[in-house]
Amino acid sequence: MLKVAINGFGRIGRNVLRAVYESGKHQQIKVVAVNELAQPEAMAHLLQYDTSHGRFGKKISHDQEHLYVHHDSSEYDPIRILHLAEIELLPWRDLEVDIVLDCTGVFGSQADGQAHIEAGAQKVLFSHPGASDLDNTIIYGVNHETLKDEHRVVSNGSCTTNCIVPIIKVLDEAFGIESGTITTIHSSMNDQQVIDAYHNDLRRTRAASQSIIPVDTKLHKGIERIFPKFSNKFEAISVRVPTVNVTAMDLSVTISTNVKVNDVNQTIVNASQCTLRDIVDYTESPLVSIDFNHDPHSAIVDGTQTRVSNGQLVKMLVWCDNEWGFANRMLDTALAMQASSQVEQ
C-alpha cells in the first residue's frame, strides 16, 4: 500500500483525493493526511459537493483533526488534517509518508521538494511544472518508464502538457514532426476575477465570465522538456474562456510525410487502443466541452475536426478535463514512482 499525503487541498488536491476512490485505486493508495490552511468544515463541504464534478459518491464527515471517507455505515477511512504553512514542520516522518502529492501550485523547486524529504517523506510529486533542476518531469504514458529510484523530486507537468504531449508523440513516431503551433482554449481559473479587480496581469483584471482572455503560457517549454529535439520548434498561445472546466487544444503541425485525414485519425485510434490505452481517447461524436467533464483521459481527439492541408500541414482538436484527467495522472505517476523504487530494490 502506497501511503501519500496531499499538500494543498484546492481544485487539484480535492480531485486527487476523490480520484483515489472513484478510480478504485484506494486498494493501492492510502491517503494518510491533507495539509490545508482552510477550516475542516469547508474542506469537507467542498470535497462532498463540487460544481464541476457533482457530488462525491462517498459520504464525507469531519472533526477538527480528521476527514472521514465513509464506505458504509460502519467502515470509513480517517485522513489526518494539518494546517501548517511551513513544509519543514509537516509530520511526514511520523505518518510514514511515502510520497507527498504537492498540489499547492506554490512550491515547485528542488529545494521545496527536499524540504518535504527532510520532513520525512520518501519522495515528492508536484502537481504543476517545476523548476528545471527537478529530478524528472513525467507525462504519464510518454516517459514514465524513465523513472528511477533516485528520482525523489518529480513534477507531473501541467494539464495541457499531459493533453498535448501524448498526441505529439504519436504523430511524430508515425509521420515525423518538423514544427508546430498550439492554441490552448482553457476554462477560467481561480487566478481570475469574478468582477473587474486588480491583478499584476492587466488582462486578468477583467471579469472572467464576460470575456475571452489571452494569458501567457509556457507550454512550448514543457514540450521541449519532454522532447529536447523540439527546442525552438513549437510555439503556443493560450486564451481563457467563460466555462468552469474542460479545455480544448488546437494543434497544428508540419510533418515530413504526405498524409490524408484518415491516416492521421487511424494512427490516433490505434494508439488509443494499444500503447496509450486509458491515456488517449478518440471520438467522432458531435460533442461539446461539457461532454468531456469528468473524463479521466489525458487527451480526447475529435476526429471530425482533423484537417490536412497540402498533405503535410495537420490540424487537430484535442479535448481534456483539465482537472479530472490531470488528477488521475497524478495517481498513475505516484504509482510509477513507487514501482521504480521496488524494481531497483
Curated annotation (Swiss-Prot):
Keywords from the named record: Cytoplasm, NAD, Oxidoreductase, Pyridoxine biosynthesis
Pathway of action: Cofactor biosynthesis; pyridoxine 5'-phosphate biosynthesis; pyridoxine 5'-phosphate from D-erythrose 4-phosphate: step 1/5
EC numbers: 1.2.1.72
Subcellular location, record wording: Cytoplasm
Top-level EC class: oxidoreductase
GO cellular component, one term: cytoplasm
Any GO BP annotation: pyridoxal phosphate biosynthetic process
GO molecular function term, any single one: NAD binding
Annotated catalysed reactions: D-erythrose 4-phosphate + NAD(+) + H2O = 4-phospho-D-erythronate + NADH + 2 H(+)
Binding of NAD(+), residues: 11-12, 322
Marked site positions, Activates thiol group during catalysis: 186
CDD domains: GAPDH_C_E4PDH (cd23937), GAPDH_N_E4PDH (cd17892)
InterPro entries: E4P_DH_bac, GlycerAld/Erythrose_P_DH, GlycerAld_3-P_DH_cat, GlycerAld_3-P_DH_NAD(P)-bd, NAD(P)-bd_dom_sf
Residues holding substrate: 158-160, 204, 217-218, 240
Residues of the active site: 159 (nucleophile)
Major localisation: cytoplasm
Function as written in the Swiss-Prot or TrEMBL entry: Catalyzes the NAD-dependent conversion of D-erythrose 4-phosphate to 4-phosphoerythronate.
Subunit structure, as described in the record: Homotetramer.
Family statement drawn from the similarity comment of this UniProt entry: Belongs to the glyceraldehyde-3-phosphate dehydrogenase family. Epd subfamily.
PANTHER family per UniProt: GLYCERALDEHYDE-3-PHOSPHATE DEHYDROGENASE 2 (PTHR43148)
Protein name per its UniProtKB record: D-erythrose-4-phosphate dehydrogenase
Gene source species: Vibrio campbellii (strain ATCC BAA-1116)
Gene giving rise to this polypeptide: epd
